[in-house]
Amino acid sequence: MSEQQMTNEAAKTLDGWYALHDFRTMDWASWKLLSSDERQSIIHEFTGLLEKWGVAQKEGKGSQTLYSIVGQKADFMLMILRPTMEELNQIELEFNKSRLAEFTIPAYSYVSVVELSNYLASGDGDPYENPHVRARLYPELPESKYVCFYPMDKRRSGNDNWYMLSMEERRNLMRSHGLIGRSYAGKVKQIITGSVGFDDYEWGVTLFSDDVLQFKKLVYEMRFDEVSARYGEFGSFFVGNHLSLDTLPQFLYV
């Protein structure tokens, strides 16, 4: 392999479940015009959808979670993981056809696939048969109290072009970057989804924790790592609180 080919060698990825982050804003003014019985009927229909989608998680064929979003960017986020893009689209359509969707306004969405790169991969055999790898590619989304989502790119400008680095340089940088993430094991669960060709950024990062301050600490610490400081470009950050079937009615109460 030539030196130029080595320089431009692309990282290979292991790909798992497809992911949809669907952010909605409630039309509270229209929602308030409904009678209490009408609202309860709509909430009942929506919880029925959530329970239906939850069957896939029990069967190990996907996962989903719901969070209320803090701030003006959105009111809630539905995150869905499924084996195929078709199943992801089907759930999106099911929600869009529901009565609750009539009282929501799309705020933002992100389409991607759970991804592991070969920067840090090692070992022999089929990685898709490795239980540790499978748990990361096909995760059950936790019911952590808090979530943080943001999209990101690797910079491609001037002397700070990630894609002009050799595989060895990128691997070394990602190794030190990964050490920071692993230092938060037990405090933050991180799911990386790849979105090159799927959405406007290259990756989506979803963080879960029972201590919301861990998001701030983790992201801030990573800012000093060269991968983020020199090559990272970030989109909007969304932070929210977990919504369960028990707390959903209170969220929608007016």
Swiss-Prot record:
Any one Pfam family match given in the protein's UniProt record, by short name: Chlor_dismutase
Listed NCBIfam families: PRK12276.1
Single Gene Ontology BP annotation: heme B biosynthetic process
Catalytic activity of the protein: Fe-coproporphyrin III + 2 H2O2 + 2 H(+) = heme b + 2 CO2 + 4 H2O; Fe-coproporphyrin III + H2O2 + H(+) = harderoheme III + CO2 + 2 H2O; harderoheme III + H2O2 + H(+) = heme b + CO2 + 2 H2O
Family, similarity comment: Belongs to the ChdC family. Type 1 subfamily.
EC main group: oxidoreductase
Binding site for Fe-coproporphyrin III: R136, Y150, P151, M152, D153, K154, H177, Q190, S228
Protein name as catalogued: Coproheme decarboxylase
UniProt entry keywords in alphabetical sequence: Heme, Heme biosynthesis, Iron, Metal-binding, Oxidoreductase
InterPro entries: CHDC, ChdC/CLD, Dimeric_a/b-barrel
Pathway annotation: Porphyrin-containing compound metabolism; protoheme biosynthesis
Gene3D superfamilies with a match to the protein in the record: Apc35880, domain 1 (3.30.70.1030)
Functional note: Involved in coproporphyrin-dependent heme b biosynthesis. Catalyzes the decarboxylation of Fe-coproporphyrin III (coproheme) to heme b (protoheme IX), the last step of the pathway. The reaction occurs in a stepwise manner with a three-propionate harderoheme intermediate.
